Swiss-Prot record:
Organism: Bos taurus (Bovine)
Location of the transit peptide in the chain: 1-22
GO biological process: glycine catabolic process; glycine decarboxylation via glycine cleavage system
Family of the protein in this entry: Belongs to the GcvT family.
Pfam families xrefs: GCV_T, GCV_T_C
InterPro entries: GCS_T, GCST_C, GCV_T_N, GcvT/YgfZ/DmdA, GcvT/YgfZ_C, TrmE/GcvT_dom1
Location of the protein in the cell: Mitochondrion
Keyword annotations: Aminotransferase, Mitochondrion, Transferase, Transit peptide
Protein name, UniProt field: Aminomethyltransferase, mitochondrial
């Protein structure tokens, strides 16, 4: 399975918005690069960065450890930006589908950059920081595209007299994910993490490092946090977290299978510029006020799809036989090609093959029997609800 996952990560690296140079010496390095090597990290090229695909543990053991305890991921390759000024919400709402104005202080939301054709340019998390700015985290592979999009809008508003401004952060970003993540982190912070629910954040001192923004979110389906930490303190913080026996380092392979079990999209594979939020089963990201106003890019395409139903839909698949990979054809029970897989892997938790892909709307109901083609052989699949594995986000009741 490890070799199969390594092959899969190489495929992900060549996906749209994830182009890489072939020369290892031109790859970006996170502040934890030497730390990874010292801890046995197997480094690979991903989205223009040198990142660990796994450590000494097998991919499966790392995956299961995250589900049962907690793991530390280096996600410093992600683009972190701050947007300042009285028009910061106006700027962001001119680019995304979400209702940013309704966010409470230190509340965040997953949103989507869209184009005028309704296609998804990237997915991102926007937090309304109580310090008076928006904190934005978006994909490394779309860094230049996202920066151009935001910087062009900044200049447009500034030319009209706005005080809006954008700052690119050089912080590292560490993700501590798993059911014991909060317990581990609580030992190093004074703030009561029981008061920090899913998709909220706070600036706090973490294991002696001041100025860290801790956000209760992640890409695994488990409870956990992402910690934006000054780059010079990243190694100190990672080492402090690893002193707890609950914590192990994890890499890209585990992160990919964890997010797939959780039914989460990978930009460039499962969603892209040719996919609308409705087609991608992401209609929930569309703010109610924004739908009514139809004032976001691509609204004239996206909003009508909410009523008329998009012609195709992203679905989950449970598959028999050999593991299913991206671009594997999806067929009707009669053997007609009707779509394609966008992500797939053996699920370490379910011990079954899981995948997601696009099929015509009439084939999207859970329980619908289909076929997938792997190495020119057809094998059974069934449309399944996502997430495949129940999520465990920390939500206050």
């Amino acid at each position: 399975m490890v070799s199969r996952l390594s092959s899969r990560l190489q495929a992900l690296a060549s996906a749209p918005c994830r182009s890489l140079s072939c020369a290892q010496d031109v790859l970006h390095r996170t502040p934890l690069y030497d730390f990874h090597l010292a801890h046995g990290g197997k480094m690979v090229a991903f989205a223009g960065w040198s990142l660990p695909v796994q450590y000494r543990d097998s991919h499966v053991n790392s995956h299961l450890h995250t589900r049962q305890h907690c793991s530390l991921f280096d996600v410093s390759h992600m683009l972190q930006t701050k947007i300042f000024g009285c028009d910061r919400v106006k700027l962001m709402e001119s680019l995304v589908v979400g209702d940013i104005a309704e966010l409470k202080p230190n509340q965040g939301t997953l949103s989507l950059f869209t184009n005028e054709a309704g296609g998804i340019l990237d997915d991102l998390i926007v937090t309304s920081a109580s310090e008076g700015h928006l904190y934005v985290v978006s994909n490394a592979g779309c860094r230049e595209k996202d920066l151009t999009l935001m910087q062009d809008k900044v200049r447009e508003l500034q030319n009209k007299g706005s005080d809006v401004a954008l700052e690119v952060m050089d912080n590292a970003l560490l993700a501590l994910q798993g059911p014991t993540a909060a317990q581990v982190l609580q030992a190093g912070v004074a703030d009561d993490l029981r008061k920090l629910p899913f998709m909220t954040s706070a600036v706090m001192e973490v294991f002696g490092v001041s100025g860290c923004r801790v956000t209760r979110c992640g890409y695994t389906g488990e409870d956990g946090v992402e910690i934006s930490v000054p780059a010079a303190e990243a190694v100190h913080l990672a080492a402090a977290l690893l002193k707890n026996p609950e914590v192990k380092l994890a890499g890209l392979a585990a992160r990919d299978s964890l997010r797939l079990e959780a039914g989460l999209c990978l930009y460039g594979n499962d969603i892209d510029e040719h996919t609308t939020p409705v087609e991608g089963s992401l209609s929930w990201t569309l703010g109610k006020r924004r739908r009514a106003a139809m004032d976001f890019p691509g609204a004239s395409v996206i909003v009508p799809q909410l009523k008329s139903k998009a012609q195709r839909r992203r679905v989950g698949l449970m598959c028999d036989g050999a593991p299913v990979r991206a671009q594997s054809p999806i067929l009707s029970p009669e053997g007609t090609v009707i779509g394609a897989v966008t992500s797939g892997c053996p699920s370490p938790c379910l011990k079954k093959n899981v995948a997601m892909g696009y099929v015509p709307y009439e084939y999207s109901r859970p329980g619908t029997p289909l076929l997938v083609e792997v190495r020119r052989k057809q094998q059974p699949a069934v449309v399944s609800k996502m997430p495949f594995v129940s999520t465990n986000y920390y939500i206050l009741k």
